[in-house]
């Protein structure tokens, strides 16, 4: 799947989740590519920057949409000690 196809599949689903849970905290558990798509979108990054977003396995990223404008609070945080 190419980046454009991934973006076209992911962003409408994220918008639907946000609409369904408006005003509530929500969690999306996904692989790194999906997380990169969301982060790149909210940061208005070009496709060339996609792989410059580090998203390790099991990492946490947090986007706050509370005022309708996305703010990245955490990106790619690893909260465990890798073996």
Locations of regions flagged by a protein language model:
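Generic beta-sheet signal
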Residues: 17, 24-33
């Amino acid at each position: 799947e190419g980046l454009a196809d991934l973006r076209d599949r992911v962003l409408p689903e994220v918008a639907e989740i946000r609409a369904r849970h408006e005003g509530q905290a929500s969690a999306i558990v996904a692989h790194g590519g999906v997380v990169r798509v969301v982060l790149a979108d909210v940061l208005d990054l070009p496709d060339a920057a996609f792989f410059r977003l580090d998203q390790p396995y099991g990492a946490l990223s947090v986007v706050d949409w509370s005022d309708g404008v996305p703010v990245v609070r955490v990106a790619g945080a690893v909260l465990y000690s890798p073996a």
